[in-house]
Amino acid sequence: MSNLSRRNFITGGAIAALGGTLAIAGCAPKGESSSTVAGAAGEGAQAWTGTANGKGGELTVEVITEGDSIARINPLKSRESYGVGTAGIDVLSDLIVKNQTLNVDMVTGATVSSMAFLTAVSDAVDASGMKSSEWKKREKAVPQAPEGLTTDVDVVVVGAGGAGYAAALTAAEAGKNVVLLEKLGIVGGDTILSGGAMAVPNNWFQKRDGIEDSVEKMAEDMIVGGDHVGDPDLVNVICEGAYGAMEWLIFNGGVAWQPYERFFGGHSVIRSLIPEGNEGSGIICKLDKRAEGLKNLKVCRNTKADELVQDASGAVVGLKATNTATGETYDFKAKAVILAAGGFGSNVEMRMKYNPEMDEKILSTDSVGATGDCHVMAEKIGANLIDMQYIQTYPTCDTQTGALLYVGNMRLENRAICINKEGDRFVEEMERRDVISNAIKEQTDGIGYMIFNQDGLDHTDIATVNAAEMDGLFGRGQLAKGETIAEACEPFGIDAAELQKTVEKWNGYCKDGADPDFNYRAALNPIEGGPYYILAYKPSVHYTMGGLHINTDAQVLDSDAAPIPGLFAAGEQAGHKMGTNRLGSCSITDVFVFGRVAGANAAALA
């Protein structure tokens, strides 16, 4: 572990427009140019607008033209996800302007946002009098590898998610030459798609609020929450390293945290920090910026790991990879390789190989890149896979897309109760994820609902931070609002009379300070007075507990439990830490603790 210095602290300023509309001036009507753009481009520049539907809703762009060329592209209105959709848009905008072409591929990992952006830009180009169809026939532009990339390095890291960035930055901070490979066109993995919550025992908010906690208590929660299947030694590394990893994120990464914590199911006390912006992008985007400032670290997007290279003794001494955008192949030589490419939740075939119940009927919250490529790659050289049958579902996900519902965090804010179509509660809302998921499967249509009211919503920042998600859910009939409980029930066909009784009973429990039905373990907050909201949800595959077997030094083990020299793994890539089930917010702790462990130990070999 490197020494931490407050001189290295980078303040975490507010991240603008997270999940919301970019507050830029309104746009001109379609097909109508603005007046000459003063001071923004060359003489005679004009602005044209185009609109399309993105993943977050309406996307409007302004294209600045100078004669027959595109000088600049500005998003006027966008609710695309920060660090994901916005990253894809940035890539395409740069390619289009630099190469004067619309012949570009969609950015993998941000496909929907990319398609919408290209459609909107094409719309604006047509409005200018030029023909987008002709621009799309021009020479194709593709993202290029980082300038100065060399294949002779000290450490290769595969997967630019939380664990990958932690490993790569730690090794680079130790003075080693590092390359970080990401097969998608954007970085972040599942970390950037998550809420970014991080379980940290003995943190300053607990001390402020008089909450007693300890490393041992968190470790016990994780072991019990995973039904005593996880390796206690690995769990202890996570819990003991949590506070240091949190400090590293602040002082070395510039990550800022909200001034409150969140209670996740299965934990015995509240201990989970929330990043500024309430999303994993509040962490990943800061780490990516930190990486950009290091000359000895190169981040290679669109670069897929193909094969591990070993010497005569069996030690891993490099890796073969392919740039999927350019077709260029690389033969990296390194003293160590760190695999941090996440799980396999998006690979249905692989899921069913280890757990036949996890078939295509169950959607996934995971990144499209979570396909288990590196599990297979490492297994080919003798690495041991462990706990692969344990696959977690997240209980409150979109019934149509499978995406994790952040509006569903009303449950974690202790402001909602879980009900079924019959209007009854069916589970303790703060239970383990697997317990809630299994309970939902037993309900009518395999769907659960949660009810909350305006007062509860106003006690959180959920409506503000997740405005785009709420609008989308209303539009697709997955979220309903009514002045009365009966009005909110109507779109879903929920038994309103029974739900009225359930809410009244709940409010009584809140006054009494106890829940005799399900022994609710968090703060009891009543749901009194409208307007009322009801959200539909069902479980989606969220996390794969199994992966490469590692030891406490993050070394990958073979079938005889012996370390494979030169090979490390971290994050969801590595198994046998969580057991049968993972407690919420422990994954973020894991990726940054073991990412740093892997990075430090890999650097020690170089």
UniProtKB/Swiss-Prot annotation:
Signal peptide interval: 1-40
UniProt-recorded name of the protein: Urocanate reductase
Native species: Eggerthella lenta (strain ATCC 25559 / DSM 2243 / CCUG 17323 / JCM 9979 / KCTC 3265 / NCTC 11813 / VPI 0255 / 1899 B)
Catalytic activity: dihydrourocanate + A = urocanate + AH2
InterPro entries assigned: FAD-dep_OxRdtase_2_FAD-bd, FAD-oxidoreductase_2, FAD/NAD-bd_sf, Flavocytochrome_c, FMN-bd, Succ_DH/fumarate_Rdtase_cat_sf, TAT_signal
Other known facts: E.lenta strain DSM 2243 is significantly more abundant in subjects with type 2 diabetes (T2D) compared with subjects with normal glucose tolerance (NGT).
Keywords per UniProt: FAD, Flavoprotein, FMN, Oxidoreductase, Phosphoprotein, Signal
Segments crossing the lipid bilayer: none
Cofactor remark: Binds 1 FAD per subunit. Binds 1 FMN covalently per subunit.
Enzyme class: oxidoreductase
